[in-house]
């Protein structure tokens, strides 16, 4: 039995992007949206992301302009729950187990997950448990520029930034039933393709639980600035406050 081949699935990637831009003498805008999806190489392994961006600049008056920039993304990642991996995203130990699992024992007999000799079935461990992570990010920037009319060369700038980040992780571990089949041979090491079931075994190394973790952060900054730039003859004067 080639356990890696049985677990492997051909991955697929889908990506779509749409953008619009335009404007007039007083206003300019750019908007875009994106979709990205990738199916994994194993069960319970996939990734989906939605993203958007909007930039609008408007000249409210001859000496006053404002801008609004908004971007964000929403992603959903799903991986098998494998308690032996310290890094759930890389799954190094799961790959190692698939490549090194003994090939002498069939994975399934008559459609039933087999665990006659080695007491567990790595394919069922992958199928029965997952980790799902949802990430949402929102960035907003509001800016304004005022060219002060009664002082030539003096401009006032203001910028407000807001960022919000949301993360929700859910781990699901399920117990599952494996089947012990009749063996033959001098060392009871042979399992026929049509071997009858002689017992069952319930595996709980994935636990039997649901755990949720939630994290949300937000931050904002406000910058106020005065700039003075003016030329007197051959001399340039600049200052920032």
List each language-model region with its residue ranges.
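Outer-membrane beta-barrel architecture
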Residues: 19-21, 32, 55, 141-145, ...
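Residues embedded in well-ordered regular secondary structure
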Residues: 1-44, 81-84
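Outer-membrane beta-barrel channels and translocator barrels
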Residues: 13, 24-25, 61, 147-151, ...
């Amino acid at each position: 039995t080639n356990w890696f081949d049985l677990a492997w699935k051909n991955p697929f990637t889908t990506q779509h992007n749409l953008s619009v831009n335009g404007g007039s003498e007083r206003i300019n805008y750019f908007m875009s949206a994106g979709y990205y999806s990738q199916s994994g190489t194993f069960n319970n392994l996939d990734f989906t992301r939605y993203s958007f961006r909007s930039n609008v600049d408007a000249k409210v008056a001859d000496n006053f302009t404002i801008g609004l920039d908004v971007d964000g993304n929403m992603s959903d990642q799903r991986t098998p729950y494998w308690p032996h991996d310290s890094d759930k995203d890389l799954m190094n130990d799961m790959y190692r187990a698939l490549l090194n699992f003994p090939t002498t024992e069939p994975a399934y007999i008559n459609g039933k997950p087999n665990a006659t000799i080695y007491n567990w079935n790595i394919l069922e461990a992958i199928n029965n448990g997952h980790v799902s992570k949802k990430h949402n990010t929102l960035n907003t920037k509001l800016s304004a520029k005022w060219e002060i009319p009664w002082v030539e060369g003096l401009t006032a700038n203001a910028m407000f930034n807001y960022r919000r980040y949301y993360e929700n992780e859910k781990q699901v571990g399920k117990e599952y039933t494996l089947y012990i089949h009749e063996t033959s041979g001098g060392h009871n090491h042979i399992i026929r393709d049509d071997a009858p079931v002689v017992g069952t075994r319930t595996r709980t190394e994935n636990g039997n639980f649901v755990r949720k973790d939630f994290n949300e952060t937000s931050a904002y900054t406000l910058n106020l600035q005065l700039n003075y730039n003016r030329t007197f003859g051959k001399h340039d004067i600049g200052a920032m406050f």
